[in-house]
């Protein structure tokens, strides 16, 4: 039985032996949070809001936080990771778990949900389903910054040049306690930005869980395209738009974001 406390993680072993750290708090039905790029479990400002009536499990994806890594990284390995954690959480709870994934984590979650029956409801916040990787010159700039130890610069390149994040939002993120953890994940960026993140139609059609897609009304067009792709592929899917928000609405307006999630999960 998992001990649900915020003081330390428990671990799940993935298919290739990678150990994945999971941080749990709260009581009630299970909810798994899967973060995106430039993040670990500490990026979630909504944990306390969601844990009012749920056991919230926030995993560290491989290569960051309390999780280990492996040399042969592919998105497929990370999908296997999420499936492993979903099944561990569901086994501990004795019931299927709800799942919330953001960005790259959302991409992993929609693929994982097509492979396991242990997802009750699925929330995807701007899942990063992209047919083309970032331009080689941009990836090279990020890699050069990482190689030189300029991790903060690498993260800021991504936020400014890929997400088109307003300077006010970037300044807000810099002031948060999770900023050092974001910066520490910079070495994982080149690999994630060098590959397409494709959604197989058959895999998406296998998602049986009711699914909520959340998008920011002001988010970049490539994320809007991703929303349309997923909405047209997952059978039981609805879309909610957060007007005036972009890719970090859970940071800029956590109360509203959490309320949208909680309302859907009550269904």
Describe the residue ranges of each PLM region:
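Conserved serine/cysteine hydrolase catalytic core
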Residues: 181-233, 238-241
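Conserved alpha/beta-hydrolase catalytic His-Asp/Glu region
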Residues: 135, 151-190
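Conserved HGGG/HGGXW glycine-rich cap/lid loop of the alpha/beta-hydrolase fold
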Residues: 5-68
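Glycine-rich His-Gly loop
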Residues: 33-37, 103, 216
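Conserved hydrolase catalytic core segment
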Residues: 95-133
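Short beta-to-alpha linker loops that shape the active-site pocket of alpha/beta-hydrolase fold enzymes
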Residues: 60-65, 128, 243-245
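Active-site loop/oxyanion-hole signature of alpha/beta-hydrolase fold enzymes
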Residues: 57-100, 259
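Catalytic histidine-centered segment of alpha/beta-hydrolase-like enzymes
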Residues: 242-258
């Amino acid at each position: 039985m998992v001990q649900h406390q915020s003081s330390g993680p428990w671990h799940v072993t993935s298919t290739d032996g990678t150990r994945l750290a999971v941080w749990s708090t709260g009581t009630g039905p299970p909810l798994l949070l899967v973060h995106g790029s430039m993040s670990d479990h500490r990026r979630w400002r909504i944990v306390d809001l969601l844990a009012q009536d749920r056991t919230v499990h926030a995993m560290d994806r491989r290569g960051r936080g309390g999780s280990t890594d492996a040399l042969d990284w592919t998105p497929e390995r990370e999908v296997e990771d999420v499936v492993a954690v979903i099944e561990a959480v569901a086994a501990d709870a004795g019931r299927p778990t709800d799942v919330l994934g953001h960005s790259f984590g959302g991409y992993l979650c929609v693929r994982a949900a097509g492979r396991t029956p242990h997802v009750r409801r699925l929330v995807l916040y701007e899942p990063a389903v992209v047919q083309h990787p970032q331009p080689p010159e941009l990836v090279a700039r990020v890699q050069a910054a990482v190689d030189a130890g300029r991790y903060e610069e690498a993260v800021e390149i991504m936020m400014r040049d890929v997400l088109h994040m307003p300077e006010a939002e970037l300044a807000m993120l810099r002031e948060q306690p999770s900023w050092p953890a974001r910066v520490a994940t910079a070495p994982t960026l080149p690999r994630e930005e060098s590959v397409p993140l494709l959604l197989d139609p058959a895999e998406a059609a296998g998602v049986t869980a009711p699914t909520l897609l959340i998008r920011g009304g002001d988010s970049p067009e490539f994320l809007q395209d991703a929303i349309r792709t997923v909405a047209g592929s997952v059978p039981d899917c609805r879309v909610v738009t957060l007007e005036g928000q972009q890719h970090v609405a859970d940071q800029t307006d956590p109360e509203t974001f959490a309320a949208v999630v909680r309302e859907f999960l009550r269904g």
